[in-house]
Amino acid sequence: MVIRVLFRPVSLIPVNNSSTPQSQGPISRRLALTALGFGVLAPNVLVACAGKVTKLAEKRPPPAPRLTFRPADSAADVVPIAPISVEVGDGWFQRVALTNSAGKVVAGAYSRDRTIYTITEPLGYDTTYTWSGSAVGHDGKAVPVAGKFTTVAPVKTINAGFQLADGQTVGIAAPVIIQFDSPISDKAAVERALTVTTDPPVEGGWAWLPDEAQGARVHWRPREYYPAGTTVDVDAKLYGLPFGDGAYGAQDMSLHFQIGRRQVVKAEVSSHRIQVVTDAGVIMDFPCSYGEADLARNVTRNGIHVVTEKYSDFYMSNPAAGYSHIHERWAVRISNNGEFIHANPMSAGAQGNSNVTNGCINLSTENAEQYYRSAVYGDPVEVTGSSIQLSYADGDIWDWAVDWDTWVSMSALPPPAAKPAATQIPVTAPVTPSDAPTPSGTPTTTNGPGG
């Protein structure tokens, strides 16, 4: 069946831009709709469709890669341990390098998607670093990676050192000592960078002792003696750390040591005897002579001393007591105020019955050698029954002469709510009295204490 549609000539509908509707026109509404259905008014319809096609055909170009530098480009006074990286958005890195002013490439690593490049080693002080490389966008076009920054120039760098050797085996009372070569104004920042890990875990804490002539010092000790066999690891992240007043740490340090057998010396002044005690019990019990105590400088100090040195031969001097360069055998130093446990045949008649020394603990030559061969750095020597307490005035290690609450109050970090107020201990070590024995660091000098 053929359907014929007849059209009468019609006039085009003029465009009416006014808001008034047209009530009548050359064709009826029905006819207009019929005409639209058969494409009579196609030119108008095509114009509208063409507009949509044009919009679909318009494609925005992909965004160019965006670079983010950390620290920002041209930054100055950057701390050399700060996180250093460059990140690209809307792209990925082809290659990236950071070089110092001497042209050395700094170690770094890409993220898995190659959108982040992170520096993996510390930087140097007072150095300009330059970024180079390229990143590729989604359009395949490369853009350069270019930037620079400068690290801080310290007013000075501060060095530090441990008193123990790495891998050393020590006694159950050995503290960890870090000696700095300069005073430190921001001790809290330094203390936060120090960690001690023990196996098995033991409770312990840092304390800042009075500064010595060479600089600040901080000690760590356990609350109680270490269990025998404990391993200790110390990590000091000091490089790049601000110490205050424009000073920075010179290097990181680490230390591993272990605690040996448990050995304690029991030294009761009024008994005129000395005992060496291990887990096996009393292994030595010797007659001895302690400080005469006629003068304060001749009093063997009360409290827990720590073995720090020992010499098979040692030359002692004590001008205040009237002698110098006296050869003694089997000398074990227990404090830096001149106290030793050593052989002294001259006091043999008093050993076991009276105290006649200048403060040292005298033994017979045979007994002194036997004790000497058993002693190691860090062994505690517990002196009781004396009239003067071991204190900060007596040298470098008096860590066990204070109670635990006093010890933790000497930390530079903010105290917990229950922590006691800081004990009033001098900021700097006291001046050695003129009549005190002269400490000695070597066994063959004339600058040794006598006793």
Curated annotation (Swiss-Prot):
Residues 437-451 have a biased composition (Low complexity). Pathway: Cell wall biogenesis; peptidoglycan biosynthesis. It comes from the Bacteria. It is an enzyme of class 2 (transferase). Residues 417-451 are annotated as: Disordered. Substrate binds at Y323, N337, G338, N362. Residues 263-384 form the L,D-TPase catalytic domain. Its EC number is 2.3.2.-. This is L,D-transpeptidase 5.
